[in-house]
UniProtKB/Swiss-Prot annotation:
It catalyses: L-seryl-[protein] + ATP = 3-O-(5'-adenylyl)-L-seryl-[protein] + diphosphate; L-threonyl-[protein] + ATP = 3-O-(5'-adenylyl)-L-threonyl-[protein] + diphosphate; L-tyrosyl-[protein] + ATP = O-(5'-adenylyl)-L-tyrosyl-[protein] + diphosphate; L-histidyl-[protein] + UTP = N(tele)-(5'-uridylyl)-L-histidyl-[protein] + diphosphate. This is Protein nucleotidyltransferase YdiU. The lineage of its organism: Bacteria, Pseudomonadati, Pseudomonadota, Alphaproteobacteria, Hyphomicrobiales. ATP binds at G86, G88, R89, K109, D121, G122, R172, R179, D258. The gene is ydiU. It comes from Rhizobium meliloti (strain 1021). Belongs to the SELO family.
């Protein structure tokens, strides 16, 4: 059997942080997909996992050294506070140290009921498991901090939702699964001792440089805010819409987590919403930075009494820290957008240049991903302008912007060929297009055909490369193929 070198620090925290629970065995598990490179990174034997991984990753066989538990947390869901949520269908097996010396969680999602399941069955359907595998690995390839997919395993038994669906278990790897909602769980109970214990644990695990800070808990809030600002800026750079930015889905580590109703934009529209449960657009594409700050304010509320013994001083420190978030986000976002349009230097007019392009894209219903990818070709040769402009409903509307952009490029130091290569390195050709994800899920769920799943994984693992044989995967959906709504899948 594969050896996992577990060292389970979270399981050594007080008992009110989690519930110990064993996975519920399933009927006939089989391994759909193993992420062999990630297994190697975690110090696991991929060959052995191909043989006996189905038993481990389904929950039928708990590996030696694992201490399975479900984590307690609360959270604001669409702005409404729920004092107890917790892992209702996810079980943390334990922690391993990877090849880079980083501590990583290994969690089974869909492994059975826990004390936090409420009325749920603790199971996952195949479709959401495949979606999370595809999108989390695509995000990693795009360079966006994210939890990872180690394995997808079929359970051999059905789950009952609006219809009967094949069941599966997703094996997730994360820097940790500690969320803003983890702090809220203890704050809701007035348990400041546990908040301090959790904060000390987080500092030791994720932010050890803060241990010697004069105000370590305030520094923790600032550090989490900085990571979230950088993360959400990266989401916007690749057209990603999380869909369910509840406080229980915001990690303290700064990784993207929980891909239930997530999606990528096709035509650029800042108001884009895909999630079926986001009826009022709270988590729309352009709202994500502000929601990030709102969530961080909820984190600050749990920590504020640790900032200073004088209440007014503590509140002022918290507000100042939260105020820095917007500045940090704007810098990350604008720096990234500069790179997307080929700029290395900073000029005051750059924000207007970026915003005017986005306005043209919105008015012209231009594809977000393809616009920036084709702009790289135009940076090298103006003959590519026609193909770029064809993405817009009124192609000629782009011409004045291109003239303005080229005048700005004249003040840049890079040769055109280097600039185009740099732009291609930040503007993907391939993303997990929503219609392609749905096609892959449908083939697997309805026909047990995983070929589209495998093909999509392959293409999106190299998002910045031109892949001439896979041009169809770069294309927007045809009429009738558009995905207008996504679902949580729980």
């Amino acid at each position: 059997m594969t050896a996992f070198r577990f060292d389970n620090s979270y399981a050594r925290l007080p008992a009110n942080f989690y519930a110990r629970v064993q996975p519920t065995p399933v009927a006939e598990p089989w391994l759909i997909k193993l992420n062999r490179p990630l297994a190697g990174e975690l110090g696991l034997d991929a060959e052995a996992l191909e043989r006996d991984g189905a038993a481990i990753f389904s929950g039928n066989l708990v590996p030696e050294g694992a201490e399975p538990l479900a984590m307690a947390y609360a959270g604001h869901q669409f702005g409404t506070f729920v004092p107890q949520l917790g892992d209702g269908r996810a079980i943390l097996l334990g922690e391993v140290t990877d090849a880079g010396g980083r501590r990583r969680d290994i969690q089974l999602k869909g492994a059975g009921q826990t004390p936090y399941s409420r009325r749920g069955d603790g199971r996952a359907a195949l479709g959401p498991v495949l979606r999370e595998y595809i999108v989390s690995e695509a995000m990693h390839a795009l360079g966006v901090p994210t939890t990872r997919a180690l394995a997808a395993t079929a359970t051999g038994q059905p789950v009952y939702r609006e219809q009967i669906l094949p069941g599966a278990v997703f094996t997730r790897v994360a820097a940790s699964h500690i969320r803003v909602g983890t702090f809220q769980f203890f704050a809701a109970r007035g348990d400041m001792e546990s908040i301090r214990t959790l904060a000390d644990y987080v500092i030791g695990r994720h932010y050890p440089e803060l241990k010697t800070d004069e105000k370590p808990y305030l520094a923790l809030l600032k550090a989490v805010a900085a990571r979230q600002a950088a993360l959400i800026a990266r989401w916007l750079h690749v057209g990603f819409i999380h869909g369910v930015m509840n406080t229980d889905n915001m990690t303290i580590s700064g990784e993207t987590i929980d891909f239930g109703p997530c999606a990528f934009m096709d035509d650029y529209d800042p108001k884009t919403v895909f999630s079926s449960i986001d009826q009022f657009g709270r988590y729309a594409y352009a709202n994500q930075p502000a929601i990030g700050q709102w969530n961080l304010a909820r984190l600050a509320e749990t920590l504020v009494t640790l900032f200073d013994p004088v209440a007014d001083t503590a509140v002022n420190l918290a507000n100042d820290a939260l105020g820095e978030y917007g500045t940090i986000f704007q810098k990350h976002w604008l720096d990234g957008m500069r790179r997307k349009i080929g700029l290395l230097t900073d000029e005051d007019e750059d924000l207007d240049l970026v915003q005017s392009l986005l306005t043209l894209m919105q008015n012209g219903k231009a594809d977000f991903t393809l616009t920036f990818r084709r702009l790289a070709a135009s940076a090298e040769n103006a003959t590519a302008d026609t193909e770029l402009a064809s993405l817009f409903e009124e192609p000629q509307a782009l011409s004045p912007w291109l003239e303005h952009w080229r005048r700005r490029l004249e003040r840049e130091p890079q040769p055109a060929t280097e600039r185009a290569a740099a732009m291609r390195s930040v503007n993907p050709a391939f993303i997990p297009r929503n219609h392609r994800v749905e096609q892959a899920i449908a083939a697997a769920t309805e026909d047990a055909d995983f070929s589209l799943f495998e093909a999509l994984l392959d293409v999106t693992s190299r998002p910045y490369e031109d892949q001439p044989g896979h041009a169809a995967y770069a294309a927007p959906p045809e009429p009738g193929e558009e995905v207008l709504q996504t679902f949580c899948g729980t």
